Amino acid sequence: YYVDNQPVVGERRIDGAWYYFNESGIMATGITVQTDRPDKVYYYDEDGKMHYGWKELDGKQYYFHPTLGVMLKGAERNIDGVWYYFNEDGVMATGWTNHHNHTYYYQNDGHMTYGEKYIDGYWYYFHERTGVMATGWAKHHDHTYYYQSNGHMYYGEKHLGNYWYYFKKGIGVMATGWTVQSEKPGKQYYYNDRGQMQYGWQAIGNDAYYFDKVYGVMKPYTFKNSNGYWLAYDRNGNLVKDLRSAFNNESSYVIKVNKPMNTVTVYMQYGDGSYTVPLVAFICSTGASTPTGTFYTPDKWRWLRMMGPSWGQWVTQISGDYLFHSVYYNSTNNNNSLSVSAYNNLG
């Protein structure tokens, strides 16, 4: 192209269209890098006109700025209300893509993915506004989820911070309230509204429940308040009178002796610190010499030599020479040394 008999070099607007002529005056077609703009790429059609918008080259999609004609490279672009990403070579991204320190997923048509997406056997979540792949905690569809560092939805138990959480199998929803883990049928757990596993005594509704202090499994009892005491009922609604097998490692107990009734009741501690949960009650021998008052047990023995000589098992000192102990045995460390008369006596 000549002007005043001189070849045009560089860009030139002719009849409303932009053209580019190299240093020899040859009109550019196809992919072109202008001499004075080495970091920018353009595309000129076969007739030399600058191209704008979408262009497929060798089976790949590119996009050229709608007014400047510059190829988009290493950038996001909202085109007709849809977000796309073009890599450093200007190729429209599809599939997994990392940029701006985040991970995204673009569909086959280049559209950015939002929300939940099932990809190659795993569920992922992409932020509804930004399209960023979720890792860690995420809330959507009125539920809470947890995604691993690779974006995979997490299922099952997980220890996060100082708490155990449970994410339901198959759907990944964080558990709250009463929960039976699919991996542990028959065992009940309770998670608060933040999803944290609960331990020990928990008041739920009008009743109370006890959850293992280490594993969080609910003991199979419902405790109901009766005149200030928490009585245990089994799953069939029957009153449970002996809880020793379920609560055998408490740190402290209160033992109350009812002298007129010749009974001993052992209480364990409730969640508020009061000793108001009957553990077990049994008959005992009492008399005028049985001391009254409040005592703290100073010592205990597995076997202890007593009068006779005879031997007592599971001996706890109450005060001075007053003890709680089994019926007497004729020798130590021998459960077979129990006499008939001793068997018929209360220790």
Protein language model annotation of sequence segments:
Residues K40, Y275-V280, S341-G347:
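Glycine-rich, flexible loop segments associated with nucleotide phosphate handling
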Residues L243-N335:
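Gly/Pro-biased beta-strand-loop elements
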Residues Y1-S251, G308:
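Extracellular adhesion/carbohydrate-binding repeat motifs centered on closely spaced tryptophans
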Residues E23, E46, E88, W314-Q317, ...:
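Active-site scaffold segments
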